[in-house]
Structure formats: C-alpha cells, structure tokens
Regions:
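Short amphipathic alpha-helix adjacent to the substrate-entry channel of hydrolases
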Residues: 32-50
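Catalytic nucleophile-loop/oxyanion-hole region of alpha/beta-hydrolase
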Residues: 30-32, 52-86, 232-234
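Active-site nucleophile elbow and catalytic-triad environment of alpha/beta-hydrolase enzymes
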Residues: 3, 118, 152-167, 172-173
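Short beta-strand/loop motif that positions the catalytic acidic residue
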Residues: 171, 177-179, 183
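Primarily recognizes the serine-hydrolase "nucleophile elbow" in alpha/beta-hydrolase
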Residues: 70-143, 155, 159
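Conserved alpha/beta-hydrolase "acid-adjacent" motif
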Residues: 184-193
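C-terminal catalytic histidine-bearing segment of alpha/beta-hydrolase fold enzymes
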Residues: 192-251
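Short beta-strand element of the alpha/beta-hydrolase
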Residues: 15-24
Length: 251
C-alpha cells in the first residue's frame, strides 16, 4: 500500500523523504494498528509512506527480507516520478517488523541477497526507524517471532543470521530506535543489544527508552489504541522525535 503525496503546482517538486513501513505481528500476521495509521501520520508530515504486507508464517527466512529489499529498490527506481529523494529512503519497523527492517539494515550488503536479486546497492535503506524491535535469537529472544521465521528445528546458520546484533557493521545505516522498560513481550534488552552493536561500529543512532508502556503501542494515542494501556502520552513523543531525526542531516 502506498501513501504518496501528489506533486502540487503550487508547492512544486520537493524531493521528499520516504519510509517503507513493516508492521509487527510476530511473523504470524501483519498488524493493522501499525500499518495505515502510521503511514497516514508520516504523509501528514510531508513524508511519502509505503506499507509492506510481507510474507509471514510458513515462509521462512529470508523470504520477507528479500521482499523488503525488492520494495526498497522499487521505491528508489521510481524516486524521480514519485518526487522522492533517492538518498532518503528509510525502513520503519515495529516488533517483528522491526526485526525485518533491521535485517535489511545489517544484511543488505550480504552476498546471499545480492546474488539472489542481482542487486548492487539499490536496495540499501538510508536509515532505520525501529519500534520495540525483535533483534536477537539468543537469551532475550521473542520465541514466537524466531520460531516463525526459522522453524521449530532451525539450522545453525539461519539462527545466527536472525540474531541481528551480531551482524551490525560499518555499512549499517543510521538508526532511530525506541522501546519500553516494562515490555514483557519483547524484552528491552533487544534494543540494548542493538545499540551496543551500533556504538561499537560507530554508527549514528538516537535511542529513547521509556519507563512504562509495554509492547505494541504503535502511535500510542487514540488513532491506534484498542485498549487504555496502549494510550501513552509520553511514549507518543517517539513519532515527532523520529520525524525530526529523519529530516535532520545525516551524520
């Protein structure tokens, strides 16, 4: 699904940023609460938005990753006609969708992607926005997400490949990431492991860790809240902070 802004004769061409949104759902389904409402909010801020309905259960790694790589390359290939800055194409993921977005961030330069898709670097995201992401297949893993992406009896290689903190490199794009301390679904240690790896590799990042909020709170307001616990005014600041960060010069 795409939520692109029309080129206006009054405004003129703007060469706007774009985000490709990967909703969460534990690699079992694609969350509606982290799809269209988020895309519309980005569009309201002058950012083109796309939602990727990626393959989930019974479609093991790297199926969804290859789909995101193709989507990123497709958006970049159409950047001129859609009034998109080809150097400002970001991936934005929530929970398991955060794992998918971060997977492209750390694996975009790997041989298995380039050889399969015959890409050079047109699929590289320029930055990542990660919301309460699944990151590790180790001690702090989200069991359901990892099982759905690699199976119940995974081979060592794919199990290592989906533990993303081990694959951050100097080629990983800059990152905005946030999480809640009291997340009892995807432990906050997932984010901590990732920012430690980013710091070790000298990758620019901005991180917010909120004391309360739990998991799966999306925009944290009436737009996406299905129950009172998903409304959190303090955590809702993540979005405006992410937009400011996204529009700031790369560092």
């Amino acid at each position: 699904m795409s939520y692109t802004l029309d080129i206006s004769c009054e405004i003129g061409r703007k060469n706007r940023p774009a985000v490709i949104i990967c909703p969460g759902g534990g690699y079992e389904f694609v969350s509606e609460r982290e799809s269209e409402p988020v895309a519309l909010r980005f569009a309201a801020m002058g950012i083109h938005a796309f939602v990727l309905n990626y393959s989930v259960i019974q479609k093991p790694f790297p199926t969804a990753l290859l789909e995101l790589a193709q989507a990123t390359a497709f958006v970049r290939a159409n950047a001129e006609s859609w009034d998109i800055d080809p150097q400002k194409i970001s991936v934005c993921g929530f929970s398991a969708g955060g794992h998918l977005a971060a997977s492209l961030g750390v694996h975009w330069d790997k041989k298995f992607i380039r050889d399969t898709l015959e890409f050079k670097d047109e699929h590289k995201p320029n930055s990542m926005i990660l919301s309460y992401p699944v990151i590790t297949s180790g001690k702090y893993k989200h069991e359901g997400s990892i099982q759905n992406i690699v199976g119940l009896q995974p081979k060592p290689t794919p199990l290592d490949l989906v533990s993303l903190e081990n694959h951050v490199s100097s080629n990983t794009p800059r990152t905005f990431i946030w999480h809640c301390c009291d997340d009892n679904v995807v432990p906050v240690e997932n984010t901590i492991l990732f920012i430690q790896a980013l710091s070790k590799n000298k990758i620019s990042f901005e991180c917010s860790i909120y004391p309360h909020g739990g998991h799966g709170i999306s925009l944290c307001d009436d737009t996406t809240s299905s129950k009172p616990s998903q409304y959190n005014e303090k955590c809702s600041q993540w979005f405006i902070n992410a937009v400011k960060w996204l529009k700031s010069p790369d560092k």
